[in-house]
Amino acid sequence: MINIRGIQGHAAYPHNAENPIHTSSEALNEIVALQWPDKSGQFPDSILQVSNIQSGTGAHNVIPGELSLKLNVRYSPSISSQTVIDAVEGILRKHKLNFSADWEDSGAPFLTTSTTLINCAIESIANVTGVNEVEQSTAGGTSDGRFIAPTGSEVVEVGPLNTSIHKVDEAVSIDELEMLTEIYGKVISKLLT
């Protein structure tokens, strides 16, 4: 969470206030334009999204005294969370904004390079779905795999299609759940034999 402070005041007297929405607009444009290409060729480029902005009292005649901003960053192993923090805070400082930041890293990216678990998953998916060209991808959302990977364990994520992920009426078909159950069972069987 980033808090950008201004000075609250009456909208009719802007010279007695400092609107953080106005003072931060150029910095926000620079922040959303940040780019971090993946250098490994195994991950999508890192992305930054503004997920929440809150400012104001709700009254139309009051200049807000603070703007709160939440960012969501999906980054590849080509950069670190500190790289993102330094870039964002550098922009805020460049624009001389009065800010405080409380950063939370929801999990570092990971990549399983061992083929044992990967091959078991690919074979199981092909066996259950009949799809022989299984796409391996590091794109997508954050999962609990980020907590397991640092232990040194192999991590492979197999899940449903995500065409409605985080949308209104998010849903997964029963058929997909049944196929996943069968795939998981086959992966376990292959690993135990």
In which residue ranges do the predicted regions lie?
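Metal-dependent amide/peptide-bond hydrolase catalytic core
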Residues: 1-193
